[in-house]
From Swiss-Prot:
Principal subcellular localization: membrane
Record keywords: ATP synthesis, Cell inner membrane, Cell membrane, CF(1), Hydrogen ion transport, Ion transport, Membrane, Transport
Matching HAMAP family: ATP_synth_delta_bact
Localization per Swiss-Prot or TrEMBL: Cell inner membrane
Protein name listed in UniProt: ATP synthase subunit delta
Keyword field contains Membrane: yes
Amino acid sequence: MSEFTTVARPYAKAAFDFAVEHQSVDRWQQMLAFAASVASNEQMTDLLSGALAPEALSETFIAICGDQLDEAGQNLIKVMAENGRLPTLTAVLEQFIQLRAAHDATAEVEVISSTTLSDEQLTKISAAMEKRLSRKVKLNCKIDKSVMAGVIIRAGDMVIDGSVRGRLERLADVLQS
């Protein structure tokens, strides 16, 4: 999969730069999401791995996408088809989303708790994480009864475990050593 990421990066960067320049980042993300879903369809996967000429492949792909792709989106599909890169569309979308998050200076923060958190608690968590990460954050809240009480916060590879379950696990580790 890392090969797909490496191959997808220049396509995602080009699409993102174009989208920013033309103030159409939302539209481009929608187009890429649709194209990635088409490319990951089982029948389309078979077609992409077949021996179709790049022109025929891009025409078929664009016809299937219909009005979902504008002219610039169709051009991206044509270039990717010419280079045999259509199977990497999902990775292109993932890279595009990462570029957008970096551009928007936002970080995805997962907050796991045993119960629904109040708006005041979410505001405090958001403010603390914005200060710690030096960027705006988008909270994705999840409920997990096994947490017992407290919260687990994940942002990228950082994990803050303030749950009772985590404390009990750490206590058990100390007692066993």
